[in-house]
UniProtKB/Swiss-Prot annotation:
F-type ATPases have 2 components, F(1) - the catalytic core - and F(0) - the membrane proton channel. F(1) has five subunits: alpha(3), beta(3), gamma(1), delta(1), epsilon(1). F(0) has four main subunits: a(1), b(1), b'(1) and c(10-14). The alpha and beta chains form an alternating ring which encloses part of the gamma chain. F(1) is attached to F(0) by a central stalk formed by the gamma and epsilon chains, while a peripheral stalk is formed by the delta, b and b' chains. The chain crosses the membrane at residues 11-31, 53-73. Belongs to the ATPase C chain family. It is found in: Cell inner membrane. InterPro entries: ATP_synth_F0_csu, ATP_synth_F0_csu_sf, ATPase_proteolipid_c-like_dom, F/V-ATP_Csub_sf. One of its GO terms (molecular function) is lipid binding. It is a multi-pass membrane protein. The gene is atpE. The record marks 61 as: Reversibly protonated during proton transport. This is ATP synthase subunit c. One of its GO terms (cellular component) is plasma membrane. HAMAP family: ATP_synth_c_bact (MF_01396).
């Protein structure tokens, strides 16, 4: 009985940690959407901002990967 409760806690914790992957997708959408809005307002400055766009997307995706790793650790290592 106690093992079942511990396993249930692992699954709940992993599910909550996996929510971060969805938050990363929302973050990437915001970064790309704001870049597109700025590029449409000032097309001449858009070429200089693409590096910043990719850095922002990389940071947002890194948070999603960290959330996924935490979920895996909660599932299999704890």
């Amino acid at each position: 009985m106690e093992g079942d409760i511990a396993q249930m806690g692992q699954f709940i914790g992993a599910g909550l940690a996996a929510i971060g992957s969805g938050a990363a997708a929302i973050g990437v959408g915001h970064v790309a959407g704001n870049f597109l809005a700025g590029a449409l307002r000032n097309p001449s400055a858009a070429a200089g901002q693409t590096a910043t766009l990719f850095i922002g997307i990389a940071f947002a995706e890194a948070l999603g990967i960290f959330a996924f790793l935490v979920a895996l650790l909660l599932m299999f290592a704890v």
